[in-house]
Amino acid sequence: MNELIPLSAVRCNYGDVSGSRSVYLTFDDGPNPFCTPLVLDVLTQHRVPATFFVIGTYAADQPELIRRMIAEGHEVANHTMTHPDLSRCEAAEIHDEVLTASRAIRLACPQALPRHMRAPYGIWTEDVLATSAKAGLAAVHWSVDPRDWSRPGVDSIVKSVLAAVRPGAIVLLHDGYPPGEEASCIDSTSREQTVRALAYLIPALQLRGFEIHPLPQLH
């Protein structure tokens, strides 16, 4: 059944099992030729890893960015092929969206082996969870959402994250736009607030004793 499920059924954080005060940075809706390189530059400058939940059609169009993500030590994860609302999709379409996206990622970079999946818009159903699990993908939501996609201002993004972050938190940020909104991303200023906020957030989190890690491998 393609029925909505409660978020309690989906991984939203990883707790503090190791006592290391881990935090996980994740980026949705890329790779984008204007914005993703800037995000990668900031991550490289601060020597921290992130997980990029990429859209398959964009991975196919920007394989060099997928290769750069992997070369620089980041994880590339599955955000479906075309970013539909999966609650409106039949089981066969969900299957195609998930598996085709993983295939596109591997074609872009054979070293990229997706281990995690995030549903577009954070809308989860029983069919989505079942399809992800069958494909060997751990379903991952988030626990901290500064709504950077709405461009609320750099200070707002930073303050929202720092106010909500806890050990084991999964932070949601964006390095692109979903299909249909590409016109919003015509140059490198489109996600400028996210990039600038990230440059503040990483040292601020570290000063608070948090360690930024890749998402744990559950499969």
UniProtKB/Swiss-Prot annotation:
A biological-process GO annotation: carbohydrate metabolic process
Swiss-Prot/TrEMBL keywords: Cytoplasm, Hydrolase, Metal-binding, Nodulation
Residue ranges annotated for the NodB homology domain, each copy included: 21-213
Binding site for a divalent metal cation: 79, 83
Residues annotated as catalytic: 28 (proton acceptor), 174 (proton donor)
EC number: 3.5.1.-
Molecular-function annotations in GO: hydrolase activity, acting on carbon-nitrogen (but not peptide) bonds; metal ion binding
Residues with site note (Raises pKa of active site His): 148
InterPro entries given in the database record: Glyco_hydro/deAcase_b/a-brl, NODB_dom, Nodulat_NodB, Polysacc_deacetylase_ArnD
Segments traversing the membrane: none
Domain of life where this protein originates: Bacteria
GO cellular component, one term: membrane
Localization per record: Cytoplasm
Pfam families according to UniProt: Polysacc_deac_1 (PF01522)
SS bonds (residue pairs): none
NCBIfam families: nodulat_NodB (TIGR04243)
Family affiliation: Belongs to the polysaccharide deacetylase family.
PANTHER family to which the protein is assigned, alphabetical: CHITIN DEACETYLASE 1-RELATED (PTHR10587:SF133), GLYCOSYL TRANSFERASE-RELATED (PTHR10587)
Annotated function: Is involved in generating a small heat-stable compound (Nod), an acylated oligomer of N-acetylglucosamine, that stimulates mitosis in various plant protoplasts.
Name of the protein this chain belongs to: Chitooligosaccharide deacetylase
Organism: Bradyrhizobium elkanii
Chain's gene name: nodB
